[in-house]
């Protein structure tokens, strides 16, 4: 297997995009890449993107560790494994069996369909309530054939306008140029890839030297639900942060998604996240 520093243009581009948004400098000189093949054939270069982003995350964590007195570290990333981790649910097993025991991840309500005007929309009914709302709107059975027939009744813009009004997880497939001209795309392009906001109270609790993990002593309240938010909080927990996940005792989720995003966290069950969020956050500890 070929091992080298980050040299692939897309890997470097992803790394530098994150690095340029940070308030401190990071360096990829101590990162090695195992150039393993992609695990899926796709025109989307997800593996190289993942390598760049995960390398930047590793550099950031290593920097924070050194600031807090931990020794410098090196990092080796496997390109194929980085791609797998973008869909880490497939790496979870229970008593030797994959936790993805059914077809929920590839059900017809998770798909891309052609509209009346020849464009395409993508929908994702990953959680039960999202699936049910999509089925109610399209008034169809949960099959690819039924979804395609229902989607073809309207134009892409008509469907997206309805989706916005009804809070449905659906959007039009757009080119990069179309996204740049769209209000949402323009707003995104106007902001840095990472935003930092402060409450002007950060000096009340200053972290000292770390003994074992770079983020030990960091306290996090997680009020997110789906995938991205829990995944981010899981990354913090992996590096030593004390993460409390607030969730209802009986929730609308899919077991593999919940398990994948809950490693290393404490679970606080509440019937209302709004009530939990209004609590003085220090009372959780």
Residue ranges and their predicted role:
Residues 1-250, 278:
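Acyl-CoA thioester-binding alpha/beta core of soluble enzymes
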Residues 162, 235, 260, 283-284:
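Alpha-helical scaffold elements within enzyme catalytic domains, especially in hydrolases
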Residues 241, 245-271:
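Glycine-rich phosphate-binding loop and adjoining beta1-alpha1-beta2 segment
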Residues 266-285:
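A structured beta-alpha segment of the ubiquitous adenosine-cofactor-binding alpha/beta core
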């Amino acid at each position: 297997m070929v091992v080298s520093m980050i040299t692939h243009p897309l890997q470097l581009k992803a790394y530098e995009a994150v690095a340029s948004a940070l308030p401190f400098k990071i360096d990829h000189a101590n990162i090695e890449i195992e150039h393993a093949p992609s695990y899926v054939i796709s025109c989307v270069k997800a593996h190289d993107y993942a390598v760049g982003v995960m390398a930047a995350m590793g550099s950031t964590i290593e920097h924070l560790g050194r600031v807090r007195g931990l020794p410098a570290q090196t990092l080796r990333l496997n390109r194929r494994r980085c791609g797998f981790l973008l869909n880490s649910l497939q790496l979870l097993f229970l008593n030797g069996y994959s936790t993805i025991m059914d077809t929920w991840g590839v059900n017809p309500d998770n798909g891309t369909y052609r509209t009346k005007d020849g464009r395409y929309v993508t929908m994702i009914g990953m959680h039960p309530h999202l699936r049910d709302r999509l089925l109610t709107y399209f008034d169809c059975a949960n099959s690819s054939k039924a979804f395609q027939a229902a989607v073809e009744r309207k134009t892409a813009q008509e469907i997206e306008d309805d989706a916005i009004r009804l809070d449905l997880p659906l959007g039009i497939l757009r080119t990069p140029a179309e996204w740049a001209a769209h209000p949402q795309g323009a707003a995104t392009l106007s902001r840095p890839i990472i935003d930092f906001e402060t409450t002007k109270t950060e000096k009340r609790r200053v972290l000292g030297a770390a003994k074992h993990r770079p983020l030990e002593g960091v306290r996090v309240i997680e009020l997110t639900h789906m995938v991205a938010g829990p995944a981010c909080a899981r990354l913090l927990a992996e590096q030593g942060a004390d993460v409390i996940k607030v969730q209802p005792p009986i929730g609308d989720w899919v077991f593999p998604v919940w398990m994948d995003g809950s490693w290393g966290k404490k679970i606080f069950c509440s019937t209302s996240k709004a009530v939990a969020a209004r609590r003085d956050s220090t009372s959780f500890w």
